[in-house]
């Protein structure tokens, strides 16, 4: 309750969820282990928009509850804070034991093929 007697929850205005630009109605059954060619797991077809498409929110809700999802969402930080994987000698012989990020690794490999 606010000081003026109104409830903050009553004054919230929700924004509509954007519609994904592709149709998900023909994506295979999740029990079959089928994934879309876009690399995104099967969407929850029980929560479509009136146009037969899933919204970002329904995809997010589905991916956070299913163990079959390929993408895990870090609710606290989001994907913007993801760190490049570290490559070591075990993955590429001759680089030494010094860890390096993906860009360094790519440059090291590419430099072998430059003329």
Swiss-Prot record:
Swiss-Prot/TrEMBL keywords: Meiosis, Nucleus
Domain of life: Eukaryota
Keyword Nucleus applies: yes
GO cellular component annotations of the record: cytosol; nucleus
Subcellular localization(s) per the UniProt record: Nucleus
Compositionally biased region (Polar residues): 99-109
Principal location: nucleus
Region (Disordered): 82-115
Primary role: Has a role in meiosis.
Name of this chain's protein: Meiotically up-regulated gene 168 protein
Gene: mug168
């Amino acid at each position: 309750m606010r000081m003026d007697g109104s409830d903050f929850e009553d004054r919230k205005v929700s924004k509509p969820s954007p519609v994904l630009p592709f149709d998900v109605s023909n994506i295979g059954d999740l029990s079959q282990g089928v994934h879309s060619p876009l690399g995104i797991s099967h969407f929850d077809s029980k929560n479509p928009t009136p146009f037969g498409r899933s919204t970002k929110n329904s995809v997010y809700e589905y991916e956070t509850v299913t163990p079959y999802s390929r993408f895990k969402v870090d609710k606290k930080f989001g994907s913007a804070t993801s760190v490049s994987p570290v490559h070591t000698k075990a993955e590429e012989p001759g680089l030494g034991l010094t860890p390096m990020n993906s860009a360094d690794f790519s440059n090291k490999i590419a430099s072998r093929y430059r003329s």
